[in-house]
């Protein structure tokens, strides 16, 4: 029997808060990337991202949160994002664009949107908070964690992603 994405979220099955929640993809992705339980991530989203119960989080609010947490997270750099700045992310959100990647076809380089599947293959080490249009999820060591259908919906373009920096002790 395959492991569901919810099994990767600490305390999700036992959480009374989770049972009544909807539109909580940001909370679940935070729980996985922060390596904390669901209730802690729920409180974090409520206090730091002003998330109301059963409501989603605006994309710009997510960007502002991660911009304030620079010591813990780093914006993922790709061919289309050489500067790693929040303004770049803001531009892509406003323009509705996705991260780009290149591949070779018959000797020619072709630039295209980076899909969730390509992102998971390319960034197969580490913890990433990933945003696609209207949804947030986590990619941990190349494994897509979010809704139960997220691992099968890999053709969605990635808008932006943040990598959790490794703690140095």
Residue ranges and their predicted role:
Residues 1-72, 76:
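Active-site nucleophile-adjacent alpha helix/oxyanion-hole segment immediately C-terminal to the catalytic cysteine
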Residues 3-6, 14, 107, 127, ...:
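Low-complexity, intrinsically disordered short peptide segments enriched in small/polar/basic residues
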């Amino acid at each position: 029997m395959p492991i569901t994405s919810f099994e990767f979220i600490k305390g999700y099955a036992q959480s009374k808060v989770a049972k009544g929640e909807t539109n909580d993809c940001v909370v679940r992705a935070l729980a996985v990337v922060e390596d904390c339980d669901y209730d802690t991530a729920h409180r974090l989203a409520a206090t730091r991202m002003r998330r109301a119960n059963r409501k989603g989080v605006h994309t710009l609010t997510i960007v502002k949160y991660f911009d304030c947490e620079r010591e813990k997270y780093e914006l993922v750099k790709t061919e289309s994002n050489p500067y790693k700045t929040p303004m770049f992310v803001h531009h892509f959100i406003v323009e509705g664009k996705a991260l780009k990647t290149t591949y070779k076809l018959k000797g020619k380089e072709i630039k295209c949107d980076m899909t969730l599947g390509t992102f998971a293959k390319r960034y197969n080490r580490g913890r990433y908070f990933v945003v696609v249009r209207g949804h947030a999820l986590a990619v941990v060591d190349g494994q897509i964690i979010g809704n139960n259908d997220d691992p099968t919906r890999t053709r969605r373009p990635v808008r932006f992603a943040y990598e959790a920096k490794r703690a140095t002790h």
